Amino acid sequence: MALSAEDRALVRALWKKLGSNVGVYTTEALERTFLAFPATKTYFSHLDLSPGSSQVRAHGQKVADALSLAVERLDDLPHALSALSHLHACQLRVDPASFQLLGHCLLVTLARHYPGDFSPALQASLDKFLSHVISALVSEYR
């Protein structure tokens, strides 16, 4: 399902509103993912996964940077995320289902922090956006 002009506008507007806090929200989403889906911790056994740890915050910022790049390059997600796709598929060997779990937790996190903005239309647009990001990230798995 392609992102419509309205989807793109809604995603970009929210991302602009998030501003420099994107990393805060992606870190919270990671913490939610680890708590709700403990199997996702498997790929991070070398990190301190306690809530608020500097290592979780650092990885949360990496997720934020990747998603911000995706927002900037909505028209070319596969190319924009190709290096990350290769890294996760070929080197880290992350289960592709983990991306969907993190995406779900990010939606929950954003809805919690922006309840007045989180309309059904925004939720649908973000869900489509995250689906496209996940599709680009798992492209190297095929």
From Swiss-Prot:
InterPro entries: Globin, Globin-like_sf, Globin/Proto, Hemoglobin_a-typ, Hemoglobin_oxygen_transport, Hemoglobin_pi
Keywords attached to this entry: Heme, Iron, Metal-binding, Oxygen transport, Transport
BP GO annotations: cellular oxidant detoxification; hydrogen peroxide catabolic process; oxygen transport
Record-listed heme b binding positions: H59, H88
One Gene Ontology molecular-function label: iron ion binding
Gene3D superfamilies for this protein: Globins
Domain Globin: 2-142
Pfam family, one: Globin
GO CC annotations on file: haptoglobin-hemoglobin complex; hemoglobin complex
Protein family according to the UniProt entry: Belongs to the globin family.
Name by which UniProt lists this protein: Hemoglobin subunit theta-1
Source organism (scientific name): Homo sapiens (Human)
